[in-house]
Amino acid sequence: SGERAAFLFVILTFFYLIFMPNKFSKYIVFLLTILIITISVFSINDKKISNRMFQQTLDQAGITKDLGNFSLEHKGHYLIAWDLFKKNKFFGVGPKNFWNNCNNILIYQKKPFVCTTHPHNTYLQLLSETGFVGFLTIFYLFLFLCFISIKHIYLKITKQLQYFNFPTICILASMLISLWPLIPTGSFFNNYINIIYFFPVGIFLWLNDEKKFF
């Protein structure tokens, strides 16, 4: 489909499952190889997908063109979110108020395509709309997921202990990749996005409470 964010989520998930030692790792490597080959074949045969998935990505990353050509819309969203955060560092401007505050500032009104309903990045949205209070809560969750993932890898390598079973690793992958900071996202306060964020959390807590996969 040419949806780069979704493709990146899939790739990151596969790599997470590979680096989290489990009995299915070799099968995941095989599936990842098949996925990359399949996408490459489709991209070669479809110039529109090829241009969006590869050429446009390389251009915006500054590899084939000046980094200044990075998506002006996204760059504008990020800069505005940062400005709003600096003016309201502790509590932000309020949930779902990015649009209102952006349109109320004259300097932003003169810049096309920069005022939108949210800044298209979870952490920048939390900083601008909820300040440090909301940001640190979610960022702590992200760091916690990183910590227990590293703990699993360490115990598996050093003591040959399986800290998490494969189903739990999949749930961890879902939570961690959803909170990955360096990728465009939907609005954090959107209902369906919150299902993606928090439904796996409920499953993880249930598994932990029942001691089914630990």
Briefly describe each language-model feature range.
Residues F14, L141, T168-F214:
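Transmembrane alpha-helices of multi-pass inner-membrane enzymes
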Residues F15-F19, F24, I28, Y108, ...:
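Hydrophobic transmembrane alpha-helices and their immediate junctions
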Residues S1, P21-D66, H77-K87, P95:
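A membrane-periplasm/extracellular boundary helix in multi-pass inner-membrane enzymes
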Residues S1, A5, I39-D46, I138-F142, ...:
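Alpha-helical transmembrane segments
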Residues S1-N22, N45-K47, G131-G134:
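Helix-loop-helix junctions and helix-breaking kinks within/between transmembrane helices
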Residues F14-P21, T38-I39, A61, F199-L205:
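Alpha-helical transmembrane segments and their membrane-interface exit regions
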Residues I63-L79, D83-K87, F91-T130:
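Long extracytoplasmic/lumenal interhelical loops at the membrane interface
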Residues S1-F9, T116-N121, I183-I196:
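Membrane-interface catalytic loops of GT-C/OST-like multi-pass glycosylation enzymes that act
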